Amino acid sequence: MSFNHQEIEKKWQGYWEENKTFRTPDETEKPKFYALDMFPYPSGAGLHVGHPEGYTATDILSRMKRMQGYNVLHPMGWDAFGLPAEQYALDTGNSPAEFTEHNINTFRNQIKSLGFSYDWDREVNTTDPNYYKWTQWIFLKLFEKGLAYVDEVPVNWCPALGTVLANEEIIDGKSERGGHPVERRPMRQWMLKITAYGDRLLEDLDELDWPESLKDMQRNWIGRSEGAEVHFNIDGTDEKFTVFTTRPDTLFGASYCVLAPEHALVADITTAEQKEAVEAYINSVKMKSDLERTELAKEKTGVFTGAYAVNPVNGEKLPIWIADYVLATYGTGAVMAVPAHDERDYEFASTFNLPMKEVVKGGDITKEAYTGDGEHVNSAFLDGLNKEEAIAKMIEWLEVTSAGNQKVTYRLRDWLFSRQRYWGEPIPVIHWEDGTMTAVKEEELPLVLPKTDNIRPSGTGESPLANIDEWVNVVDPETGKKGRRETNTMPQWAGSCWYYLRYIDPNNSEALVDPEKVKQWLPVDIYIGGAEHAVLHLLYARFWHKVLYDIGVVPTKEPFQQLFNQGMILGENNEKMSKSKGNVVNPDDIVASHGADTLRLYEMFMGPLDASIAWSENGLDGARRFLDRVWRLFVQDNGELSEKITDAPNKELEKAYHQTVKKVTEDYAELRFNTAISQMMVFINDAYKAETLPKEYVEGFVKMIAPVAPHIGEELWSKLGYNETITYASWPTFDESKLVEDEVEIVVQVMGKVRAKLTMSKDASKEEMEQLALEAIKDQIEGKTVRKVIVVPGKLVNVVAN
């Protein structure tokens, strides 16, 4: 008979809730273990089968660690601000807060139905004013340190959505959400100076136990490069511009310069003859995203401005072009072009028939750019030097003549922190009529998002908050000065930058987190989530953490010691699950038909945790069959414990049991859940063949399967006679000496041909081996004379007889 999953799951979920089984105490002598999941955005679609994969992994670890005597912090919460709720509100007229609350309730019920051991007393919600009070507090600290500032920046403006979009939210020049056209326009935006932390964000990666591929993604995103800034005067004017180059040694080979179309100097330096062509080109660029302008651009485009720059090193006049592959937001928005030694410059020069001048020997510039090292030529005081020597000498010359200086730059840009939306944290700043701006006082936080029915975009580029006069207009009570509140809101990234800290002390109204508690719990021991957050979320969270470290709020330099990305669960046809393809699997249906324990077991058994694997109904059925086999082995049809279970030891199961404890313990710790489950299956097969089952082994097995299948684990534990939960029972241990083979298989040969195989003690003497071997093959050697017996201890006996 199989078990009734619906009955058992309801029973134990009720028990855990009533007894607060997973409540994490703060004061404890035990060692700590902090297991963190990337908290979900509570969408209208509810939980999908991809969510529980990572959640089950952290839950198995959390449950094992509790049994190993750790105090475990394993929390859950909601990343609940964001565009979808606002779009829904615009489309339906309902409030984003109601929509979000409804979705959170659905998600919470779904997550609870899967039996995860979260401490729900620590639940956080980024849209709760008691939570975002501290998101705003962190913003004030950034503002005080000069790390939050206002700037005019070219942004991706989407008229249909009425907001600015990040590069990542744009695909092929259209918004990812809704497919609306996007254009570039300069706007006043809040920026966070993440670049000030570039070196530390880069260097501290070395100390982390993260996948190397993920560290590389962060390193590339930060993109540190060393080189020089060079100042170019514009011929016939007092104007100048600066370029950054990693190859100042090639300055003698510069043959033209390129400015970004948005560069502030373009309008001033363009000649009357070129004005029309330049303006037409600038307009054509407005519709392109940064990605389309750089990495996706198939051919180089550009226009000559009519102006010339003066090369500081030799006085040569270099034509100034504009081209979309140079971005105003990257570097200085200007480049010196050395087509003989740079592939991109070479393509551009070839397209527009611009001159090339070789200054490093080693290639054939009639065929392609030469970017390697070599002897410098046509370079006056650099002639004969190699690349490294020439770079050092040129930087020295630039600094002596004030024509430039040594410089380190980053690919990393400052973080565009404002959104023209309603559903986000208000930025606690007031702009006064005299042009000054001040932060809201700490004691006035949280600055609460006002309730309103009118969340349509203002159309001016400001957020819908600009429509709420009574909220936006303020008067200074001391001076009578008038002001307006900042109407931009924070991006969804803000609340998720620090949520792992709030779980440590979720109800503290006096501080972001208690210093003693944060010292106890940090760093997070393991953080599991999807690879789609590999760069931005993790980089932003590390940045905020370092700022909090600098002001003494947190005691560690890094937030997450170990990080792991789970793979994706694909549809049965190996395609990504999506509503449009109709291949989405709803976990609620599986919980109803097969049970939560089966879903958890199946997702862990599908394959390695970091692999992307297709969903399979057959695999799901197989997982349920295994749990049924476990149940039937231990429980009779009448619900009583199997009569095979006894207090007596069983030598034939001893080795299999100790092997299983060792492998499961090690595999769980290393996140190799699929192989741990395989080993448990092997043990159950052995146990079915055994005459009796020692109770000690049954209890040990139940403890091992409980982290994966907690409901059946609890039910079997109670059937074994225990009144309290299995949660804090002690984890089984193994004896290394029991893993050693006592017996070995010996091959018996006659004249070199195998005639028998014998099992005997591994310590058997040569005499014993010979005696047993001759006994086993006496039929084969009857009537023959044994000339010689060769014995290899522990391996074989070869009999020479004729």
Swiss-Prot record:
Transmembrane segments: none annotated. Pfam families: Anticodon_1 (PF08264), tRNA-synt_1 (PF00133), tRNA-synt_1_2 (PF13603), tRNA-synt_1g (PF09334). ATP binds at residue 579. InterPro entries: aa-tRNA-synth_I_CS, aa-tRNA-synth_Ia, Leu-tRNA-ligase, Leu_tRNA-synth_edit, M/V/L/I-tRNA-synth_anticd-bd, Methionyl/Leucyl_tRNA_Synth, Rossmann-like_a/b/a_fold, tRNAsynth_Ia_anticodon-bd. Keywords: Aminoacyl-tRNA synthetase, ATP-binding, Cytoplasm, Ligase, Nucleotide-binding, Protein biosynthesis. It is found in: Cytoplasm. Gene3D superfamilies: 3.10.20.590, HUPs, Isoleucyl-tRNA Synthetase, Domain 1. The keyword Protein biosynthesis applies. Its EC number is 6.1.1.4. A motif ('HIGH' region) lies at residues 40-51. One of its GO terms (biological process) is leucyl-tRNA aminoacylation. GO terms for molecular function: aminoacyl-tRNA deacylase activity; ATP binding; leucine-tRNA ligase activity. SUPFAM superfamilies: Anticodon-binding domain of a subclass of class I aminoacyl-tRNA synthetases (SSF47323), Nucleotidylyl transferase (SSF52374), ValRS/IleRS/LeuRS editing domain (SSF50677). It catalyses: tRNA(Leu) + L-leucine + ATP = L-leucyl-tRNA(Leu) + AMP + diphosphate. Belongs to the class-I aminoacyl-tRNA synthetase family. This is Leucine--tRNA ligase. It comes from Bacillus cereus (strain AH187).
